[in-house]
């Protein structure tokens, strides 16, 4: 046995024998490889596990700051507008130009622009007598709240004003188009109610009443505008795509239009002489972005106060219409439509299969004809080879052939 395997491993504790030296070299190499992996050293550097798991990915994102909210341009504009309002308010009581006063343009035979300005400016009421003579001691209207509200006759007719705690963007310009003469005239009530406007410096300015103006009953907005601005940091009602406010305690656009219409109608009916309408300062009917700063008020042919029309610019979204339609359908009708669709699909599939089969048949015919042509060529070539062989055998003993063989033999040598 030892003669068959003369090569012994010299490693301690290993007495294996091998037939040749190559096997022994491979075995020793295995010993060297195992000896290199000794016990783990305690002073070696511990490598941290950096496997990219989802938890570590989210942690890295939080450390870098990817989950932080980006600074919005609207918030920057809001802060800038609030700083400007604070600077203007701290400048002095006399340096007040009502930064967000809207202009009302009443279109009649000739367009007239009425710009409401502070009481100390001479252009505030160009056609009004002194304010103290026209002031009536009936129920005054204090313009303080930032949004319009509906009031009944005999109560406060209009609430519009400026609130320094809720600064707004540059106010929209309202364009009021006078209604055609075929519409009804709004009469004034028995008792005229004066309007008092609170300015930003704390002064109260009584506004004179004006002649009755025909007001429209439908307000068509050129663009969807939310009644309450959604400012970051200030809670507000969520607004969906069509511009309507969520029904959690907030009015829908139709209710807001009815409110605004009723307020304007009551205000105009309470005005019976003077320079026209009274406009609040910053928070007017609708607070909008600068690019949404025009509200066009038009009168339809036959308006209905209880059912305000919706302009084409505000399409009502039909959510879930397809689902409701499928629910309302009869099951037999649904099954019939399903079978019709199946029949149409089956006919299309049969047509495709027929075209495929016809193309395969054409290809098979072409290949068959080509095969027949090739077989004919092979037969002709075989016949020609046979004829040539016969000629060669016939001229086997010819002197010319013998001479050729001799010359070929000499050339071969």
Swiss-Prot record:
The keyword Transcription applies. Residues 81-140, 299-337 are annotated as: Disordered. Residues 1-285 are annotated as: Transactivation domain. Residues 334-354 are annotated as: Basic motif. Its main location: nucleus. Residues 332-395 form the bZIP domain. Disruption phenotype: Mice exhibit abnormal behaviors and increased 5-HT receptor 5B (Htr5b) mRNA levels in the dorsal raphe nuclei. They also exhibit reduced adipose tissue mass, showing a role for ATF7 in adipocyte differentiation. They develop severe ulceration and inflammation associated with increased epithelial apoptosis on dextran-sulfate sodium (DSS) exposure and were less able to regenerate colonic crypts on irradiation. When combined with loss of ATF2, mice show even more epithelial damage in response to DSS. In addition, loss of ATF7 leads to telomere shortening and chromosome instability. On EGF stimulation, phosphorylated first on Thr-53 allowing subsequent phosphorylation on Thr-51. This latter phosphorylation prevents sumoylation, increases binding to TAF12 and enhances transcriptional activity. Social isolation stress as well as TNF-alpha also induce the phosphorylation of ATF7. Phosphorylated in proliferating colonic and small intestinal epithelial cells. Sumoylation delays nuclear localization and inhibits transactivation activity through preventing binding to TAF12. RANBP2 appears to be the specific E3 ligase. Keywords: Activator, Chromosome, DNA-binding, Isopeptide bond, Metal-binding, Nucleus, Phosphoprotein, Telomere, Transcription, Transcription regulation, Ubl conjugation, Zinc, Zinc-finger. It is found in: Nucleus; Nucleus, Nucleoplasm; Chromosome, Telomere. GO terms for biological process: heart development; hematopoietic progenitor cell differentiation; hepatocyte apoptotic process; in utero embryonic development; liver development; p38MAPK cascade. CDD domains: bZIP_ATF2, GCN4_cent. Residues 326-337 have a biased composition (Basic and acidic residues). SUPFAM superfamilies: beta-beta-alpha zinc fingers, Leucine zipper domain. The modification Phosphothreonine is found at residues 51, 53, 101. The keyword Methyltransferase does not apply. GO terms for molecular function: DNA binding; DNA-binding transcription factor activity; zinc ion binding. Homodimer; binds DNA as homodimer. Heterodimer; heterodimerizes with other members of ATF family and with JUN family members. Interacts with JNK2; the interaction does not phosphorylate ATF7 but acts as a docking site for other ATF-associated partners such as JUN family members. Interacts (via its transactivation domain) with TAF12 the interaction potentiates the transactivation activity and is inhibited by ATF7 sumoylation. Interacts with TAF4; the interaction inhibits the TAF12-dependent transactivation. Stress-responsive chromatin regulator that plays a role in various biological processes including innate immunological memory, adipocyte differentiation or telomerase regulation. In absence of stress, contributes to the formation of heterochromatin and heterochromatin-like structure by recruiting histone H3K9 tri- and di-methyltransferases thus silencing the transcription of target genes such as Htr5b, STAT1 in adipocytes, or genes involved in innate immunity in macrophages and adipocytes. This is Cyclic AMP-dependent transcription factor ATF-7. It comes from Mus musculus. The gene is Atf7.
């Amino acid at each position: 046995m030892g003669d068959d395997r003369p090569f012994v491993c010299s490693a301690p504790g290993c007495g294996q024998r091998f037939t040749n030296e190559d096997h022994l070299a491979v075995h020793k190499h295995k010993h060297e490889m195992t000896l290199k992996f000794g016990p783990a050293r305690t002073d070696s550097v511990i490598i941290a596990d950096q496997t990219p798991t989802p938890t570590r990915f989210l942690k890295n994102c939080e450390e870098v700051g990817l989950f932080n909210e980006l600074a919005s341009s609207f918030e920057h504009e809001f802060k800038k507008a609030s700083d400007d309002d604070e600077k203007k308010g701290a400048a002095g009581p006399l340096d007040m130009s009502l930064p967000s006063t809207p202009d009302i343009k009443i279109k009649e035979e000739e367009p007239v622009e009425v710009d409401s300005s502070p009481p100390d400016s001479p252009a505030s009421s160009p056609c009004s007598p002194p304010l103290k003579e026209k002031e009536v001691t009936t129920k005054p209207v204090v313009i303080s709240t930032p949004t319009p509200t509906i009031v009944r006759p005999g109560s406060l007719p209009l609430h519009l004003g400026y609130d320094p705690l809720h600064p707004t963007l540059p106010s929209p310009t309202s364009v009021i188009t006078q209604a055609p003469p075929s519409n009804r005239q709004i009469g004034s009530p028995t008792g005229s109610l004066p309007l008092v406007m609170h300015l930003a410096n704390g002064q109260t300015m009584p506004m004179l009443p004006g002649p009755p103006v025909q007001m429209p009953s439908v307000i068509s907005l050129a663009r969807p505008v939310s009644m309450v601005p959604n400012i970051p940091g200030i809670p507000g009602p969520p607004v969906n795509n069509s511009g309507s406010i969520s029904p959690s305690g907030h009015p829908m656009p139709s209710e807001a239009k009815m409110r605004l219409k009723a307020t304007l109608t009551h205000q105009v009916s309470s005005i019976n002489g003077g320079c026209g309408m009274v406009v609040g300062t910053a928070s007017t009917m609708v607070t909008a972005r600068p690019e949404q700063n025009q509200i066009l008020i038009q009168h339809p042919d036959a308006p209905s106060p209880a059912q305000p029309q919706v302009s084409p610019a505000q399409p009502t979204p039909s959510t879930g219409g397809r689902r409701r339609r499928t629910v309302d359908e009869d099951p037999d009708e649904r099954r019939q439509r399903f079978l019709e669709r199946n029949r149409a699909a089956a006919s299309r599939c049969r047509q495709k299969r027929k075209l495929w089969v016809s193309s395969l048949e054409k290809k098979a015919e072409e290949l068959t004809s080509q095969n027949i042509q090739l077989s004919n060529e092979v037969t002709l070539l075989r016949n020609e080879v046979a004829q040539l062989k016969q000629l060669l055998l016939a001229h086997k003993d010819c002197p010319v052939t013998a001479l050729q063989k001799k010359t070929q033999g000499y050339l071969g040598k």
